[in-house]
Each structure stands twice: as structure tokens, then as C-alpha cells.
Curated annotation (Swiss-Prot):
Domain of life, per lineage: Archaea
Biological process, per Gene Ontology: translation
GO molecular function per UniProt: structural constituent of ribosome
Alphabetically ordered keywords of this record: Ribonucleoprotein, Ribosomal protein
Record carries keyword Ribonucleoprotein: yes
Family membership: Belongs to the eukaryotic ribosomal protein eS6 family.
Pfam families per record: Ribosomal_S6e
GO CC terms in record: ribonucleoprotein complex; ribosome
Name of the protein this chain belongs to: Small ribosomal subunit protein eS6
InterPro entries, per the entry: Ribosomal_eS6 (IPR001377), Ribosomal_eS6_arc (IPR020924)
């Protein structure tokens, strides 16, 4: 199963996309820290912040498991509130990565020795 892993760098404000065939991500949850070596980033430590499945349904941290559910929302990830007090039932994925997930969002927690984007760092 191929995963697209988006790595966000909070220092530069840029994000980088990698692909991996690793099954080491299956079973991990939102908030777990993983090694950057899974996406060829030696020395980096990444934190899983979200993702989406093959149909485009977003993952949500407070839905436990890997299944898709229709939940009633009033705010938070997966729902943009248009009016105050408005609630809506939305289809969302759970917080666990399974074979149905295609996109995984991560952020850098610990930096490695090599630059993230592949371009050399300036010495200015």
C-alpha cells in the first residue's frame, strides 16, 4: 500500500511530499511520533497530525479506530462552521492509519543533520 506523506516544516513554513510503501505506518494513530527514516529523512522525528482516505474523507483525532463514521459536528477538523450554533452530520475517518488511508500529514518534531528540502542551507 502506497502512502503519500506530507511533512510540514514549522521553521520555514514549507511542506514536502514523499511516497512510501512501508507497512510500519499501519496501526499508528494521530499524535504518535514516527521515525523520519520511513520517508528517507534520516535523523528526523515526525508527529502524525492527520490524513485522509482514498475517498477524501478526513481523519479526526477523537474518533477511535480506523473505520469511517457519520458524526454530528459543531466545530473542529473536518467541518467549517458557517453560522453560530449550526451542527451538521459529516462522514469522517477514525484516528488510526489503515490500508484505506492514502495521505498522512506530519510535522517535524526533531530535525536531522541533512536539510529537509534537499537544497543546501545558506550560511548567511
Amino acid at each position: 500500500m502506497a502512502f503519500k506523506v506530507v511533512v510540514s516544516d514549522s521553521k520555514t513554513g514549507k511542506s514536502y511530499q514523499f511516497e512510501t510503501e512501508s507497512n510500519a505506518l499501519i496501526g499508528k494513530k494521530i499524535g504518535d511520533e514516527i521515525s523520519g527514516s520511513i520517508v528517507e529523512l534520516e535523523g528526523y522525528k515526525l508527529k502524525i497530525t492527520g490524513g485522509s482516505d482514498r475517498c477524501g474523507f478526513a481523519m479526526r483525532h477523537d474518533i477511535h479506530g480506523a473505520m469511517k463514521m457519520r458524526v454530528l459536528l459543531k466545530e473542529g477538523p473536518g467541518y467549517n462552521v458557517k453560522e453560530k450554533g449550526l451542527r451538521r452530520r459529516k462522514s469522517l475517518r477514525g484516528n488510526t492509519i489503515s490500508k484505506d488511508i492514502t495521505l498522512i500529514n506530519t510535522k517535524v518534531v526533531e530535525y536531522g543533520s541533512a536539510p529537509l528540502g534537499g537544497e543546501p542551507e545558506s550560511t548567511e
